[in-house]
Amino acid sequence: MKNFKLNRVKYKNIMSVGQNGIDIQLDKVQKTLITGRNGGGKSTMLEAITFGLFGKPFRDVKKGQLINSTNKKELLVELWMEYDEKKYYIKRGQKPNVFEITVNGTRLNESASSKDFQAEFEQLIGMSYASFKQIVVLGTAGYTPFMGLSTPARRKLVEDLLEVGTLAEMDKLNKALIRELNSQNQVLDVKKDSIIQQIKIYNDNVERQKKLTGDNLTRLQNMYDDLAKEARTLKSEIEEANERLVNIVLDEDPTDAFNKIGQEAFLIKSKIDSYNKVINMYHEGGLCPTCLSQLSSGDKVVSKIKDKVSECTHSFEQLSTHRDNLKVLVDEYRDNIKTQQSLANDIRNKKQSLIAAVDKAKKVKAAIEKASSEFIDHADEIALLQEELDKIVKTKTNLVMEKYHRGILTDMLKDSGIKGAIIKKYIPLFNKQINHYLKIMEADYVFTLDEEFNETIKSRGREDFSYASFSEGEKARIDIALLFTWRDIASIVSGVSISTLILDEVFDGSFDAEGIKGVANIINSMKNTNVFIISHKDHDPQEYGQHLQMKKVGRFTVMV
């Protein structure tokens, strides 16, 4: 079993002790009595030991108030102790500040801060400031009895004794990690939302381009298709017109022959008219206007003229028939000419329209190709963002799982979890030891703590009590019983035997004779413990291994 033992303390310029320091061997005898008048400095040893171990006063005063008010400097405490078979030398002071620790002759390297160095030292010696004030020292100044502590403070003390404080540290660390996980999750959420938004922007842009380009391409393609159809139609119509034009065969123009026959017919008609005029003259009779001879219808000349008329009429009829035939040919010829001209004009116009349609189609085709080439595809960017998003989702999934597991750990580290189970296991032992010591001090009641460290006090034939309802003497019995119980529990749990006990003015308070006798019996049974009883009352020095007297000489305390 490990042993916590104070060997020696040397101090100066602390409280009422001046430059001429005090040196006390702490492991010399089993019981030491320290006496002196009020204000004589008999409790200064306790302040020196507390300051040496923890850098704090034992009483509720500021650290600077420990410095001797006359010299106002060079407070120095030197403390020798043993723990776990290692010898420690602690040197601590103020004005100037000093904090040195030597283990088995080797000085420890100081941490970055004195606070960290102090925490490291307390881990080395297995003792905290709160534990020290509950299991090593029982006093009236600077001491708050266990029952005077708040429920959280009671629990904290017991957790320290049961060494489940590590679970509290684990809980703090776990909660810090959960906060970090929450922070990382928030950062990932921001990144995820940002990437999703970027992907959406790219996709929207692609869709917008598809819509705009698609609508434009559709419009252009429709234009191109219409122009191509128009060109094909024009080409077909031109080919058809050419074929019709080729099929039109023009003979020799009959117009001249027609006109010539017309002239001939006109001349013959004129002759006929002249002949008929002469015949009429003969029929009418009278004198010839030329020869003045008598004209008669029976004249032979009339017969000859009629023959001429008949001859001319026959010729005229032949010419008229021929002329009518030529008229048909002339009309047909002219119709063919008109058709040729119309087809030629139509072909020319359609060729121009075809050329215009082809030119437009080429321009539209170029516009289609340009519109297609201007489409921006964000596939690569989207793929990279999606890959990053997948990584974030995977990381976030891992964080969520870790947070879930840490949530389970949080439940386990709650007061109702592992710590609660450990405390519940020790509660019966607490109550057994408390009542063991109360019995030694002849208490006529049973004191019980529950898992929330609320007390129940029962006495045969009387109603339940509370700690506050007791007299100061009975409270002192309970406080002493708890002190020795915590010492026992600390020893059982840690495997450390605490070989030092300091009782500061405990016997000067509300204890009655039976209570003092009971405490004395407990102390006398602690064979391997150095007990220091600080008191201003009269005691029998013969009952103690040594008697140290503190007294004021002038303004300073000395040991005599």
Swiss-Prot record:
MF (Gene Ontology): ATP binding; ATP hydrolysis activity; DNA binding; exonuclease activity
Gene3D superfamilies: P-loop containing nucleotide triphosphate hydrolases
Entry annotated with the keyword Coiled coil: no
SUPFAM superfamilies: P-loop containing nucleoside triphosphate hydrolases, Rad50 coiled-coil Zn hook
Annotated GO biological process: degradation of host chromosome by virus; double-strand break repair; symbiont-mediated suppression of host gene expression
EC class: hydrolase
Keyword field: ATP-binding, Bacterial host gene expression shutoff by virus, Degradation of host chromosome by virus, DNA damage, DNA repair, DNA-binding, Exonuclease, Host gene expression shutoff by virus, Host-virus interaction, Hydrolase, Nuclease, Nucleotide-binding
Domain of life: Viruses
Enzyme Commission numbers on file: 3.1.11.-
Pfam families to which the protein is assigned, alphabetical: AAA_23
Keyword DNA repair recorded: yes
Chain positions recorded as ATP binding sites: G36, R37, N38, G39, G40, G41, K42, S43
InterPro entries named in the record: P-loop_NTPase, Rad50/SbcC_AAA
Subunit structure: Consists of two subunits: gp46 and gp47.
Family: To phage T5 protein D13 and to yeast RAD52.
Main function: Exonuclease that plays a role in viral genome replication, DNA recombination, and host DNA degradation.
UniProt protein name: Exonuclease subunit 2
